[in-house]
Regions:
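Small-residue-rich helix-interface/hinge motifs
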Residues: 2-34, 56-113, 147-152, 156-176
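Membrane-interface alpha-helices at helix entry/exit sites of multi-pass transporters
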Residues: 110-113, 183-193
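Bateman (tandem CBS) regulatory domains
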Residues: 249-263, 270, 312-326
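The conserved cystathionine-beta-synthase
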Residues: 263-282, 288-289, 298, 304-308, ...
């Protein structure tokens, strides 16, 4: 397990599946701790004879199995994309769940819908398998853990299919509107507005249902309503902004903004980077792995600061920083390019443009922001 970081984010690399790296955000440990504490009373009720340390250990099985369910959800997205000919850059498991990054845009409504539906389908299959196992497992602690995991997968599957961004169901709705109207941006904006309505419904459900039953909403229920409602509202708003931005970006062209870049193998030392000619600004250094995929960038100033005697023994990675997948853009023109740029500049101070032929160049964030400013500002 190795640590990678980019754009200020740090995560642990757990390994790879099908050649695609799997990362875990450290914040997931907080989720695991909270879930363990919440599940501990259930374990103690099901197995009262267990000592507290053993009960805590048993309670950790729930977040671990839930982790496997989230990973299965993301692997299903990635597997569907690969089956449809799309590259998958990485799987990331985070505080709020996970996400899958793709190497190119989901180019058609059908592809977008199929890839989006694969994740909830995986959770649905796990719920069905769990339900079948519950019929043969003897009552006791294993059955309680299995039942909790089964119900959780069923809830995750159903919740993710709700038709509003940023949920998978919202992506499916976006694809449907895209197919009917021929305009993806209309689908993104529409799914975003439905997501906002859904956020309000979620909050109302948690708060108003207890009142309708003559009970006061609990503090825990109110907290969950606030957190889930905020997440859905934020994701829905981002979908609306992205749709509007793409709609107004038909004339956007990234190519004039590209700066030269020198491509170097990530396994090389600092000495492998030749010095720039006198009076010429050194190009950005882009690190690639043996497969040619961009993995990081090195600042020329940091390279120049390495003393000559130790340059051959200093690996490039010592003066480089990893890039998040969103900082590598594959589209150069129009709304697709602007959409990738919008995601990338929020995660990194430099973007790397690539094509099927390799690295095309880099664009610093400040250059992009200046180019995106409206005239007269």
């Amino acid at each position: 397990m190795t640590i990678a970081g980019g754009g200020g984010a740090r995560r642990w690399r757990l390994g790879s599946v099908g050649g695609t790296p799997v990362y875990l955000a450290p914040s997931w440990l907080l989720v695991a701790a909270v879930l363990t504490l919440l599940f501990l009373p259930t374990v103690q009720l099901a197995a009262p004879r267990l000592s507290t340390p053993v009960a805590v250990l048993a309670a950790t099985s729930f977040p671990i199995l839930l982790f496997a369910s989230v990973l299965a959800h993301e692997l299903a997205h990635g597997g569907a994309a690969k089956a449809l000919g799309l590259p998958v850059r990485e799987y990331v498991l985070t505080f709020w769940g996970g996400h899958t990054s793709f190497g190119s845009d989901l180019r058609t409504p059908g592809v977008s819908a199929l890839v989006s539906a694969a994740g909830p389908l995986a959770n649905g299959v796990l719920a069905v398998v769990g339900w079948g196992l519950l019929r043969v497992v003897e009552p006791g602690l294993p059955a309680v853990i299995l039942a909790s995991l089964t119900y959780t997968n069923a809830i995750v599957a159903v919740f993710n299919l709700l038709p509003g961004s940023p949920l998978d169901g919202g992506r499916i709705l976006e694809a449907l509107v895209w197919k009917v109207t021929g305009d993806r941006d209309t689908g993104a904006i529409g799914a975003g507005w439905v997501g906002r309505v859904l956020a309000g419904v979620i909050v109302a459900w948690f708060l108003l249902v207890p009142l309708a039953q003559g009970r006061q909403p609990t503090l825990t229920g109110a907290a969950w309503a606030a957190v889930i409602g905020y997440l859905v509202w934020s994701g829905a708003s981002q979908s609306i902004r992205l749709g509007r931005a793409r709609r107004s970006a038909a004339g956007f062209d990234l190519r004039p903004l590209l700066r030269p870049a020198q491509v170097v193998d990530v396994r090389a030392s600092v000495a492998a980077v030749p010095a720039a000619p006198w009076g010429v600004a050194p190009p950005a250094i882009v690190l690639v792995d043996p497969a040619g995929s961009v993995v990081g960038v090195a600042d020329p100033a940091a390279l120049a600061a390495v003393p000559g005697p130790v340059r051959p023994s200093t690996p490039l990675t010592a003066v480089a920083r990893a890039l998040p997948a969103t900082a590598v853009v594959t589209a150069l023109q129009g709304s697709a390019a602007l959409g990738q740029v919008a995601r990338g500049i929020g995660a990194s101070d430099v973007l790397v443009a690539v094509s099927e032929h390799g690295v095309l160049g880099v664009v610093p964030r400040d250059v992009l922001l200046a180019a995106l400013q409206p005239p007269g500002r």
